[in-house]
Amino acid sequence: MKIYLDVCCFNRPFDDQTQDRIRIESEVVLTILNRCLCDWVLVGSEVIDYEISKIPDDEKRTRVEILASISRKRMAVDEDLVKRASEFEEIGLRAVDALHVASAERSADVMLTTDDEIIRKAKRLIRIRVKNPVRWLMEVVENES
């Protein structure tokens, strides 16, 4: 299974853990990353690297880079990817989010994000599943049983 996490997911373990949703999503993201060490393939991208490089807090950026570094496959941005991303921009996604969606579509079986707006908008056009990590992992665990 090839999994694409957007930067929201990589940031989640370092967000405010006093909120229940954030804490649960954080635990699930770490569980998914752990499974990517042996069972699944984490897909990285130039878009992920770029967005992580823009994290202003040096300590948080370094921690996020460490999590993202376990990716075993990496998507480069090319003209076709930018063209596909522009289609996602037309439905209202921000440019960087559109690039994530296009990268995931080309390289992964599922794109995971904690951004409900991306899920709502992208799932209508993308050829792979776009899910919240908690909901997706619950489905996977149920199917494994």
For the regions a protein language model found, what residue spans apply to each?
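Short beta-strand scaffold positions
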Residues: 76, 95-98, 113
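Alpha-helix capping/helix-boundary segments
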Residues: 9, 48, 81, 99-100, ...
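Acidic, PIN/NYN-like endoribonuclease modules and their adjacent C-terminal/linker elements
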Residues: 2, 16-23, 34, 90, ...
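Short, basic, glycine/proline-bearing loop/turn elements
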Residues: 14-18, 78-89
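Phosphate- and divalent-cation-binding pockets in alpha/beta enzyme and binding domains
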Residues: 51, 84, 120-121
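Short, aromatic/basic amphipathic alpha-helical patches
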Residues: 58-66, 120-126
